[in-house]
Each structure stands twice: as C-alpha cells, then as structure tokens.
C-alpha cells in the first residue's frame, strides 16, 4: 500500500516538472519576453507622444504675476457696457490721446460719437460776459486732465480705476477733469480768501470733491462705480467769536 502511494506521488511530481512554464516565468531573452518588451516600449513611446501633444495643446500655466500683468495691460471691454451707462459726467473722458486743456473764460463740452468711444472736445464761451480786469476770484484754482489708478468710491472703499481699455481692438485711456486750489495751505488760519474782511471772519480756501461715474475693476470684471474726484476750490468762512 505504501509502495503504491510513493509511486503516485513521484508520478505527480514528474508531471508538474514537465508542464510548460507560463509567460510570467519565462527567462529574459525568450520570445515571450521580447514580445512583452516590445509592447511595453511601444506603449511607453505612445504615452510620451500623447503627453507631448497634450502639453502643446495645453501649455503649462503661467505664474500669477504674469497673468496679472497681462490682464492689466490689455483689458478688453464689451461695447455693450457703454450702452448701459447712466449718469454720464463731462468730467470723465475716454480718449486715444491726451485731451486739450480748457482755456480761461471757456468751458469744455463733450460731443458723443456713436461710432467710436472717443469724444471730440469743443470749447465755447460762457453765457456770462467776459470778466473785467478788476474782477478776481475769491480762491485761485487750477484744472487739468489727470489719470487715476485708485480712488475712493461712494461707500468709502478704495477701488482700482481702469486706465487702459481695449474696445474694438483699440486702446483708450480714461481721463478725469479735476479742479483744485492752486496753492493749498495746510494751515487754514494763514490761508485767507481774497476779499473777505479778516476783522469779522476767518477764511481759507479748500478743495471740494464730488462723485462721478467711472469704469473700475471689480475682481476680473469691469463695472461702473461712483468715485470721488476734485472738482472745485471754494472759500470757507468762520465768524470770529471775539466780536460778540
């Protein structure tokens, strides 16, 4: 009985040893290994080629600074944004070139052009007669077209003002017509207005501001906002208490 068991065990072991080996156990250099190597190399080459093509179609993302500079340098604005504009102010101008300064005794009037965003400027005389040489202003002021990058909005927050605007593949600049005191004095006591009786009144000249609607940046979108700009130089008078 034991002899028969030994014979069956030996026959079973011989059968296992004589069975063909699988591809996983094929030694290197055999045909099966060569086929697997060729297939692996082909897949690797195809993967590299696909990755290279993907990189060409989807280039590596730029740095945040480069993206920010690019967006600021060339901001494209939808023309429909200007069609919805309300509360237009003559102190806000979009132009491809610096606007001329208004001369004394003249005011600036803007003419809208439907074809382009640029506005032509014409000067016309005031309705009131020309000042005589003996007439003087209470406070001396100066006016000029300026470019603003930041401003305070109607809520008191600092906002970014758009400078260059790309509309219909043409770059425009946003100008603001500001008026301020010519020689502002930080000490109101030593800055008296012209023609005010100093025996009864303390007076000084100061620059006042008003709100105009300007094109600003809100995140990555352009939007209209009310911002403050200098618009006049006025005289402030205070009655002296010593006279009571």
Curated annotation (Swiss-Prot):
GO terms for cellular component: axon; dendrite; extracellular space; synaptic vesicle. It is found in: Secreted. Residues 47-67 are annotated as: Disordered. InterPro entries: Cystine-knot_cytokine (IPR029034), Nerve_growth_factor-like (IPR020408), Nerve_growth_factor-rel (IPR002072), Nerve_growth_factor_bsu (IPR020425), Nerve_growth_factor_CS (IPR019846), Venom_nerve_growth_factor (IPR020433). Residues 19-125 form a propeptide. SMART domains: NGF. Disulfide bonds join 139-205, 181-233, 193-235. Nerve growth factor is important for the development and maintenance of the sympathetic and sensory nervous systems. It stimulates division and differentiation of sympathetic and embryonic sensory neurons as well as basal forebrain cholinergic neurons in the brain. Its relevance in the snake venom is not clear. However, it has been shown to inhibit metalloproteinase-dependent proteolysis of platelet glycoprotein Ib alpha, suggesting a metalloproteinase inhibition to prevent metalloprotease autodigestion and/or protection against prey proteases. PROSITE patterns: NGF_1, NGF_2. Keywords: Cleavage on pair of basic residues, Disulfide bond, Growth factor, Lipid-binding, Metalloenzyme inhibitor, Metalloprotease inhibitor, Protease inhibitor, Secreted, Signal, Toxin. Expressed by the venom gland. Residues 1-18 form the signal peptide. It comes from Notechis scutatus scutatus (Mainland tiger snake). Its main location: secreted. Homodimer; non-covalently linked. One of its GO terms (biological process) is modulation of chemical synaptic transmission. Belongs to the NGF-beta family. One of its GO terms (molecular function) is lipid binding. This is Venom nerve growth factor 1. Residues 47-66 have a biased composition (Basic and acidic residues).
